[in-house]
């Protein structure tokens, strides 16, 4: 099991939103593939300026924020939907400084049976095979481009640096690598990312001779340099023993994949690239291993302002303004309408969260699917049998806190990501982190290095304090447009492993239950007291395991009021806030704290655990939020919460004029045969663009059928003829044909099946 990041595509997404976001996901999938991991779930976290502002206010040399957020969402979702990857969590963070450069980051979860992962050395004589997509000029300069400062002319000159994604081809690579007999032939593997052939193949052995003339091309006319550095997508390089080359190429052909031997491992430690029979690169490995010139810099750390302490201010200014006027209802409603609190359901619904049939949590929970989940959870993608093992992933980050203090921002990013895992039923002691950093462009100015230095120090301190490591990450230091810088960004992704039965969901369950706040202890500098937090999270996990806590929500800087409303929306239950709760308690910063729903008859369990807690309120049947004399109906709260981004990411379809047929047949009962003696054969054809064959196969096998799948090969006329003949035989022997869903030329193929007569 592993996770992978995709921060590097903030640059191309700013230039070409659709393609840049698509390659963000494609690149993230390829990295676990190099370890033979099958990616089964993705998390998308993005940053933008306000997308509701008029287009007329767009900066010169920039695309409008509305264009960026819509285009990037379309690109990422298109790629994920085509390749058949569930996007389990989607969140867009809004901050005015992301107008400098959009943030497009995320993470994916991948897994593979341990027996399938072979890691050996490359020996002289070994062959390197390039498989997958062809090479073109798209992506030339993408690696260096991602580190450029953006100017007024970047949008006109950097378009060629954006790669063109090809999800169906990458799906074929996934299928190939998922076959045990294939993965065990691979001695070493590398994906094609930044640097293209020169890096992907150049990293596989100390001595290499690469024949660039053998690299498959999208079109003629590419010179040696372009072939060597192009970052065209969906390509992999594998090292195999010479005796296994033909076998590997045969397996690739079965999956309808191009595969070509392009390099050989040599005894002499030199990297040689040949083009048209002549070497155009011939470098000593010792020189490459120096990693370039040694560099040092001075750092001058900015101390956060005590007067501007983020923990002493309202996270949403409109809330503070309303509270000064004595308008608690107005403050609560304004909070729900804030860009970083409001519903993003229109955005989330652009993504397929259920493909693969492994997702445990949907993005929104409850009877009305209105309570947003904070953690994505999925079962491991086993091909045979069943599993109750699940993986969990969450994120933590607040750009406003980080802008005040990058150190505190990183500390609480780690803490918040942990709290979300714990609130979903995870065991914090098993958590591992991976960080993504995104900062302004660095120069020789010592003050500009303050942000990454302070942020990394904060993340390091949090890891040491909690005793939990970060095992990966990515960074970018190019978040500058002219004189505008992105906010200092360190996003913590927390990953955990749990059992299916341990998971709890955040929507309120039952009227009469109590809402309880567990608060973390902080020192005089507003830093969490790590040992106390660890003890608290451990006890909360025990309470979720034994059923005392039935739902929970990790608080953020927006406080209790936002969390109470979001927990209530899913089942449209109300909450009566206790009279002892102050407005400060309702709206203050709650980073690291957890709000939990507990049945009234189980409250004694908190005393047994010797837990400090505050009773916030009681769940009610009537869908109203009551606080003293203040009453907010469910409808009022939902209107405020759902209206903010409706014009950017609509959730309401245009009303049709045609009457909907109401004569729908409804069966009183479903008959399932108990005596499964006969095993009908189901034939599932796998066409280019198909992506549901695995879950379809498992569904039929659970029902007692025998399933046969075949890939339709179309690289040559002979492949097509052979495939037609094979399909004809398989259809003749089958009782059912099932055409799984997928994409062909971007068009959805609907689920359908044919039952064949038997004679």
Language model features with spans:
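Glycine/proline-enriched, intrinsically flexible loops and inter-domain linkers
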Residues: 1-4, 8-746
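Single conserved hydrophobic/aromatic residue that forms the stacking wall/gate
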Residues: 2-7, 753, 758-759
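Active-site-adjacent pocket-lining segments in enzyme domains
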Residues: 747-751
């Amino acid at each position: 099991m592993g996770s992978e990041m995709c921060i590097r595509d903030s640059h191309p997404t700013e230039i070409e939103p659709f393609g840049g976001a698509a390659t963000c996901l494609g690149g993230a999938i390829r990295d676990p593939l190099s370890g033979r991991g099958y990616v089964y779930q993705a998390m998308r976290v993005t940053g933008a300026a306000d997308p509701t502002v008029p287009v007329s206010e767009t900066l010169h040399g920039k695309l409008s924020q509305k264009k960026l957020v819509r285009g990037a969402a379309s690109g990422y979702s298109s790629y994920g939907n085509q390749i058949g990857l569930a996007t389990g969590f989607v969140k867009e963070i809004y901050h005015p400084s992301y107008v400098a450069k959009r943030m497009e980051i995320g993470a994916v979860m991948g897994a593979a049976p341990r027996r399938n992962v072979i890691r050996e050395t490359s020996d002289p004589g070994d062959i390197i095979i390039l498989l997958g997509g062809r090479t073109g000029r798209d992506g030339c300069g993408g690696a260096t481009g991602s580190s450029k400062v953006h100017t007024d002319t970047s949008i006109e000159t950097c378009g060629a640096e954006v790669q063109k994604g090809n999800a169906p081809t990458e799906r074929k690579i996934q299928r190939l690598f998922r076959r045990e007999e294939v993965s065990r032939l691979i001695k070493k593997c590398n994906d094609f990312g930044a640097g293209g052939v020169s890096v992907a193949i150049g990293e596989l052995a100390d001595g290499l001779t690469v024949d660039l003339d053998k690299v498959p091309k999208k079109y003629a006319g590419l010179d040696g340099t372009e072939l060597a550095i192009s970052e065209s997508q969906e390509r992999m390089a594998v090292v195999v023993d010479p005796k296994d080359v033909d076998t590997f190429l045969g397996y690739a052909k079965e999956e309808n994949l191009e595969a070509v031997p392009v390099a050989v491992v040599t005894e002499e430690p030199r990297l040689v690239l040949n083009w048209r029979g002549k070497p155009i690169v011939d470098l000593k490995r010792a020189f490459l291993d120096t990693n370039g010139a040694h560099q040092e810099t001075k750092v001058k750390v900015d101390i956060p302002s005590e007067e501007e302490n983020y923990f002493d201010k309202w996270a949403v200014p409109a809330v503070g303004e309303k509270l000064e006027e004595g308008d608690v209802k107005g403050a609560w409603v304004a909070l729900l309408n804030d860009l970083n609190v409001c519903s993003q359901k229109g955005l989330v619904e652009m993504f397929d969260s259920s493909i693969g049939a492994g997702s445990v949590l949907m993005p929104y929970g409850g009877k009305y699917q209105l309570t947003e989940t904070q953690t994505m959870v999925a079962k491991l993608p086993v091909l045979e049998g069943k599993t109750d093992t699940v993986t969990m992933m969450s994120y933590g980050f607040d750009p406003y806190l980080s802008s005040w203090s990058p150190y505190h921002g990183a500390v609480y990013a780690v803490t918040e990501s942990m709290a979300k895992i714990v609130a979903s039923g995870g065991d914090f002691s098993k958590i591992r982190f991976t960080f993504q950093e995104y900062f302004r462009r660095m120069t020789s100015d010592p003050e500009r290095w303050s942000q990454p230095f302070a942020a990394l120090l904060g993340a390091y301190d949090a890891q040491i304090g909690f005793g939990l490591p970060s095992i990966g990450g990515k960074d970018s230091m190019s978040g500058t447009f002219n004189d505008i810088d992105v906010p200092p960004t360190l996003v913590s992704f927390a990953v955990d492993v749990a059992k299916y039965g341990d998971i709890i969901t955040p929507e309120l369950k039952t009227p009469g239950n109590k809402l309880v706040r567990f608060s973390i202890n902080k020192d005089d500098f507003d830093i969490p007291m790590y040992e106390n937090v660890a003890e608290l999270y451990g006890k909360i996990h025990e309470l979720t395991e034994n059923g005392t806590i039935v739902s929970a929500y990790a608080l953020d800087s927006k406080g209790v009021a936002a969390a109470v409303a979001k927990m209530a929306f899913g089942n449209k239950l109300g909450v009566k806030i206790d009279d002892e709760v102050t407005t400060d308690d309702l709206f203050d910063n709650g980073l690291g704290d957890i709000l939990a729903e507990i049945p009234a008859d189980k409250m004694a369990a908190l005393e047994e655990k010797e837990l400090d807690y505050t009773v916030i309120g009681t769940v009610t049947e009537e869908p109203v939020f009551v606080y003293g004399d203040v009453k907010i109906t469910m409808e009022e709260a939902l209107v405020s919460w759902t209206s903010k981004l409706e014009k950017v990411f609509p959730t309401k379809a245009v009303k049709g004029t045609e009457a909907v047929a109401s004569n729908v047949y409804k069966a009183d009962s479903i008959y399932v045969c108990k005596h499964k003696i006969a095993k009908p054969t189901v034939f599932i054809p796998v066409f280019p663009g198909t992506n549901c064959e695995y879950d379809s196969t498992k569904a039929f096998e659970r029902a007692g059928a025998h399933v046969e799948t075949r890939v339709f090969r179309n690289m040559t006329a002979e492949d097509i003829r052979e495939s037609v003949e094979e399909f004809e035989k398989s259809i003749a022997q089958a009782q059912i044909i099932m055409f799984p869903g997928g994409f062909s030329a971007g068009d959805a193929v609907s689920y359908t099946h044919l039952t064949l007569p038997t004679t």
